[in-house]
Amino acid sequence: MMVSFFDQFASPSYLGIPLIAIAIALPWVLYPTSSSRWINNRLITIQGWFINRFTNQLMLPLNVGGHKWALLLASLMIFLITINMLGLLPYTFTPTTQLSLNMGFAVPLWLATVIIGMRNQPTVALGHLLPEGTPIPLIPVLIIIETISLFIRPLALGVRLTANLTAGHLLIQLIATAVFVLMPMMPTVAILTATVLFLLTLLEVAVAMIQAYVFVLLLSLYLQENV
């Protein structure tokens, strides 16, 4: 029986019940919660420090009206990082390799930023569709181009996250398969390939965190235009 490399991206099911809901809910169980003690343990302290640093960095370019998004964006960042990191473990399923899930995150949040801009400052929001100093003959063309680029934003968010994680998982599986095939025939080459696999895994750990950060950072930039 031939197994496709893309089988790892198929949503698992048990007795016909999709298990993607469990894969999405599992990270929330792993987060440590603060206790009533005066001094927290090291893990909670590091988690609190990371959240504070990230929130301050993310909210720095936003005005006071955008600070109410801090909790949502910080929670989304930690959630995406956890899902991406858990997906690097063997025999696990990564929900963020599904374009439908990523679009489910990207479209509502992008749409919320657009609605906020149209409600609070419609003139400024519509002004983004026409760059200042545009020649009069180019005005209709530029409005169409800017409108298309506006609606492409959520698609770019979802596709970027999906494509980067999918490509990384495929490369890891391809090189791991090569290691097992080369081990009995050419052990030296297999060891070198295993070293490449280890370095690629470290790179994928970085990509898993960076892509989650980029996803949330772009949302904050879209929010900055509309608050």
Curated annotation (Swiss-Prot):
Main location: mitochondrion
InterPro entries registered for this protein in UniProt: ATP_synth_F0_asu, ATP_synth_F0_asu_AS, ATP_synth_F0_asu_bact/mt, F0_ATP_A_sf
Membrane-protein topology: Multi-pass membrane protein
Segments passing through the bilayer: 9-29, 69-89, 98-118, 132-152, 165-185, 190-210
UniProt GO BP: proton motive force-driven ATP synthesis; proton transmembrane transport
Annotated localization: Mitochondrion inner membrane
Protein name: ATP synthase F(0) complex subunit a
Keyword field: ATP synthesis, CF(0), Hydrogen ion transport, Ion transport, Membrane, Mitochondrion, Mitochondrion inner membrane, Transmembrane, Transmembrane helix, Transport
Annotated gene: mt-atp6
Superkingdom of this protein's organism: Eukaryota
Phylogenetic placement of the source organism: Eukaryota, Metazoa, Chordata, Craniata, Vertebrata
Gene3D superfamilies: ATP synthase, F0 complex, subunit A (1.20.120.220)
Reactions performed catalytically: H(+)(in) = H(+)(out)
Coiled coil ranges: none
Role of this protein: Subunit a, of the mitochondrial membrane ATP synthase complex (F(1)F(0) ATP synthase or Complex V) that produces ATP from ADP in the presence of a proton gradient across the membrane which is generated by electron transport complexes of the respiratory chain. ATP synthase complex consist of a soluble F(1) head domain - the catalytic core - and a membrane F(1) domain - the membrane proton channel. These two domains are linked by a central stalk rotating inside the F(1) region and a stationary peripheral stalk.
